[in-house]
């Protein structure tokens, strides 16, 4: 590619509305342009990277035995009603009607469509297992699109769906997808982790996320220092403390706390250790519990894990916190004065709360707290469950080592769906025993456009993007100095350009009539890994300058050795 015949579209200034570095650099490098909130046009440089990612994904999916299909973006509403997700999915599902007043959706995912297809095409266990994938545009009406293509409303995704008659068969395909995903992200030279995760709205029994480690990530990922345990913080179990509850040393007393409506204010004003305080959170109770609200207790320095709380049978789904009006109607006090003593509601305490002694909590009277609370003496120990997020230093759930926490960007997710969709949609085959059997399913997603942003978050400096070779828009940039005035510079540039292309190298020749500083800055900004600078002075000694974008080192290479040298440097 020649810059004179290419839309480079680089920008010097950082856009004011771009929050994260990947969004800033994708705009500055001329990869994307915003059309509307959460909607982006991909420019040539962006498309080149997107296609490189897409090709790696496709190759590894084919290697793993998956079969490519293409399904419509527009899906009839009756499939979503049949699966039960029409009501469950919420406002992120964009719904509309056609001219015949028939309801449709723009697909955020394709479980319903593929299940509908396969129940009409497959009728015997002999035809299974099968795994189908597509790389296609999806749409989710995000309430707050942000971070550029990281959380866009329209995005490119690889989604795959497998069908089986046994759990063992599903596990085999699940393991194959796990391996394929690991190969995909390894080929892209990304620093990633596969972590245990919650199944979320997709459903199912088991799931792993593939997280690219980056400080800008939205997810907290926990790792064990003593094993290969890794999980999303939403999923990680907080083990019960091993030490027994300390005996009571304080008397129960009620204290005036008119200016302490939060744990932080209570700790500051009364010099209490925060680990000696308890937060009482009221949420809506499950309708079958016979109560409107249920109280959840976590230690003052811990955060409630809403995913864990929502799974409790006593808690309504989705988890909803009680409003101040509901709290006052039930308790007679505001949210800042709640506590477990004399509380006339069902109570569930976190495991760490169950071993506390001499702790402080609200007195269920505005402006008052109890100090010196002790279980069994002042109130009965309630139901105990794992309610909190783990913190650094916790014992790993597998009992090996302690936990560390890092930030991650989710780029892939695999699920064992089981029969959630096939049962709801009556997707059956004739089993080995001659009877109809509901198929078991798995699903496997990669955010193709999100991978591009995640790679930038992990590979950049103050001059621009530093692409891994495998997904760079161009592998080599040829920068001829004053080629329009020097015949031998132009001749070598053209010869090198032709030769590299004949070797299958993606190369960009900067043939613009631009100052060298502009040419260097643009190639650094768009992240070309290998740069060759051709100048008259160096040609006197039959040399050119090579610069590696990642390490920043320059070295002189003989003109007769350039091609061989570049082929040895490029990771292919």
Swiss-Prot record:
Q: What is known of its domains?
A: Consists of three domains: the N-terminal catalytic domain, the editing domain and the C-terminal anticodon-binding domain.
Which terms under GO biological process does the entry name? prolyl-tRNA aminoacylation
A GO cellular component term found in this entry reads: cytosol
Cellular localisation: Cytoplasm
Q: Does the keyword Membrane apply?
A: no
Q: How does it assemble?
A: Homodimer.
Q: What EC number(s) are associated with this protein in UniProt?
A: 6.1.1.15
What is this protein's name? Answer: Proline--tRNA ligase
Enzyme class, spelled out: ligase
Pfam families tied to this protein: HGTP_anticodon, tRNA-synt_2b, tRNA_edit
Q: What is its main location?
A: cytoplasm
Catalytic function, reaction form: tRNA(Pro) + L-proline + ATP = L-prolyl-tRNA(Pro) + AMP + diphosphate
Q: Where are the transmembrane segments?
A: none
Give a yes or no for keyword DNA-binding in this entry.
no
Q: Which InterPro entries match?
A: aa-tRNA-synt_IIb, aa-tRNA-synth_II, aa-tRNA-synth_II/BPL/LPL, Anticodon-bd, Anticodon-bd_dom_sf, Pro-tRNA-ligase_IIa, Pro-tRNA-synth_IIa_bac-type, Pro-tRNA-Synthase_IIa_type1
Single GO MF descriptor = aminoacyl-tRNA deacylase activity
Family indicated by similarity: Belongs to the class-II aminoacyl-tRNA synthetase family. ProS type 1 subfamily.
Q: Which UniProt keywords apply?
A: Aminoacyl-tRNA synthetase, ATP-binding, Cytoplasm, Ligase, Nucleotide-binding, Protein biosynthesis
| The protein's role, per its UniProt record | Catalyzes the attachment of proline to tRNA(Pro) in a two-step reaction: proline is first activated by ATP to form Pro-AMP and then transferred to the acceptor end of tRNA(Pro). As ProRS can inadvertently accommodate and process non-cognate amino acids such as alanine and cysteine, to avoid such errors it has two additional distinct editing activities against alanine. One activity is designated as 'pretransfer' editing and involves the tRNA(Pro)-independent hydrolysis of activated Ala-AMP.
